[in-house]
């Protein structure tokens, strides 16, 4: 999980979702997981 100021899709499988008021990226590749800090 990377905590970043700006989250964006890295590949075409990345999905931008909103959880508990935070923008997150979920992907089949676990290295692409991100959360807005």
Swiss-Prot record:
Belongs to the bacterial ribosomal protein bL36 family. GO terms for biological process: translation. One of its GO terms (cellular component) is ribosome. Keywords: Chloroplast, Plastid, Ribonucleoprotein, Ribosomal protein. This is Large ribosomal subunit protein bL36c. It is found in: Plastid, Chloroplast. The lineage of its organism: Eukaryota, Viridiplantae, Streptophyta, Embryophyta, Tracheophyta. One of its GO terms (molecular function) is structural constituent of ribosome.
């Amino acid at each position: 999980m990377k905590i970043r100021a700006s989250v964006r899709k890295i590949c075409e499988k990345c999905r931008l979702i909103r959880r508990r008021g935070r923008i997150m990226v979920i992907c089949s590749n676990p290295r692409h997981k991100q959360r807005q800090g």
